Every structure is written in C-alpha cells, then in structure tokens.
Amino acid sequence: MAEERNWKRIKERLPLQLPVRINCRETSDFEWTEVTRLINVTPFGAGFTLKRPTERGRLLHMTIPMPRQLRVYDHVEDQYRIWAIVRYLRGRTTPPASGFEVGVAFIGKRPPESYKSQPWKRYEISNGPFDKLAVLDETWQPGPRDVTDSHTRHNMAVDMRVELVDVNGAIVESEQTVTENISVQGASLFTTLDVSVGRFIRVTSEQYRVTAFAAIRSRTTGADGVPRIHVEFVDRQWPL
C-alpha cells in the first residue's frame, strides 16, 4: 500500500530525458530497433520521439535505465525491460523537426500470447495499465463494405509513390502507382511490391502535395489478376 501511495504521488509526468531502446516487430520476419530519449515518464507510461512510424495499439518493447522508485513491474535489474502499448502518435511536421511524437502505457514484462504469431495486431486497454488487453477489431474488408457515412470511400485514381524502408530506415523499394479507391482514413492501391501485412509504408502524392505513413491491413488480388494492398493512414487523414 505504501508503494501504491508513492506511485500516486509521482503519477504526474516527470521530464526525465533518459535514453531508451525501442524494439518493434512489424511482422513475424521484420523488426527494427531505435535508440532515442524519453521526453517524460511516469510509473505507468512515457513519451518520446521516433524517426520511424508506428500506430496506436501496437506493442513496443522498451529498455530504460529507469529509477527503481518509478518502476511497477521490476525493481531488481539495472535496466527496466518493459512492454508498452502505443496510446498516442503525432507526426512532427514543423521544420527542422521530423519523425513522430509517441505516448505509451506500460503493460508488463511479457507480451500477450497472440503477439508471438501476429506481432502486427493492435490492442487496447480500457482504463489503466493493470487492465486486460483486448485486440482491436482490425477487420478491413476492401470494396463496398468500406463505404460508411463517416468515411466515404471514393472510387478514384490518385497518384501515389509507395516507399518501403529497411531495418536501418533506408528506402529499399519504391513504386509509382495509383489508388483504386481512397477515403480520409485509408486506401486501396494497385502494387507489384511484395510487402507483408503489418508493415508500414510511406505514400506520397504529388497531385495532393501530401505525404503520409500507412499500415498495411490486408492484401488481395482482383478479378483482373492485379494485386492490391489495403492500407490505413496512421499519422494523418487524407485531405479529400
């Protein structure tokens, strides 16, 4: 109980710029690691910046030289190795800043069992870091089922440059293509790139003068034999 009272006293965000190692598995066979610094921290979560995209609901593994009085799950090891769920993501667009501001909630020393086979799954916690995780509904049905009152999907060809980055953040593949349909929330794009569900891509339209990051939700092949990827924008809405 005394420890719980101490946590309540320090639940406000503390501006500790500690180094942190972030590991993210986008798919079963692709992961990356980035070293950055915390902006602020509490016993239950932290804020920091990343050069790479992620999204709300994704799980990240963090290694932090965290003061023991701020820890909830481990008070023995020198390094605090903790799993966290992304609760907030905002792109930094004002020069010279770039990348993303990220806010996470710590969830424990081990990930959910489903993470092992499907690391791209997104999760949610209802009230606090001690609540059970629930898998967010990721159903993404391309075509007419995507058309809703709030996010109308327009059957229009928007030019897109699709870029895929490697573990070092360098562009390794790119393709100029068009959308089959698009909404403010996501799009279906024709592609010949062999890119897995769960990966993040960068898309740029000269027509709209817009660059956005997106997560691949599914892949399909149409009746015309042409592959499509169905993506959801993670850092902004598309200006239609």
Segments (PLM) and residue ranges:
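Structured alpha-helical
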Residues: 1-240
